[in-house]
Amino acid sequence: MKKYMTGAVRLSAMVAGIMMAWQAAAAQPKELNLGILGGQNATQQIGDNQCVKAFLDKELNVDTKLRNSSDYSGVIQGLLGGKVDVVLSMSPSSYASVYLNNPKAVDIVGIAVDDKDQSRGYHSVVIVKADSPYKTLDDLKGKAFGFADPDSTSGYLIPNHAFKEKFGGNADNKYNNTFSSVTFSGGHEQDILGVLNGQFAGAVTWASMVGDYNTGYTTGAFNRLIRMDHPDLMKQIRIIWQSPLIPNGPILVSNALPADFKAKVVAAVKKLDTEDHACFIKAMGGTQHIGPGSVADFQQIIDMKRELVLAPG
């Protein structure tokens, strides 16, 4: 009888172990949704993230879907709705939008840090055509101006704050009619091209302001556009204003993922950075790596975003 009971216990333990393993396998998602912010050339962005897909597919035994949004809002809503699982390069302002809607929606894996000088930030800049007469923001009075996306940090949140302090008013009234028009182009690439083709006298974009000017600096919209099809870009534009340092964007993972799988995703993203850094650089759009980060790094951005939401414009 004792031998029978021992065998029954062993069988029960074996069945329980099999059930636990089956449940763990069932909890492992078969797909991983990688969110990519819009506002850049979609073909290039998807191409730059193919190596990320291949790495995560192999590392996590999943089918990684590249969710390239036409605007920043698509990724924000994807994170809030559980349709986007991980984002490597998130706008701080877009993260603030997620946080203000649901502080527990995502966790910060880390913050992007520049490989060259270990800086943890970048700048919003106003550009004009190199051969234009404009030297300062005041010179753009009465001219057409371009912002990027309403959820962009450097492409709207930061310059909007600066313009309100300098000129008064808001975007809706063109900062007390300082500009003849204020337009959201949809992204940084569109802003730069808008200046080149004469749509805007001035527009905002972003750059690390670290490294070689002629290559578009280590990271930023100039760098991406030069790599794509504008090798002489930096000879065609001129920077007339730059913001104080803005914290680099966070790398995010969704808390909607099962806890065990979420931990694997975080480990895989960090492994991508260290074991295939060239791929990580390609996806980030510049020479960056993952450094430690927390909500505190973005508190000022969150506060500015909250103020903007409460007082639109």
Predicted regions and their residues:
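Pocket-lining segment of extracytoplasmic ligand-binding domains
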Residues: 150-258
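Alpha-to-beta junction loops
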Residues: 80-89, 103-105, 144-145, 190, ...
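Periplasmic-binding protein-like
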Residues: 33-37, 45, 108-125, 177, ...
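Pocket-flanking alpha-helical
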Residues: 67-104, 212-213
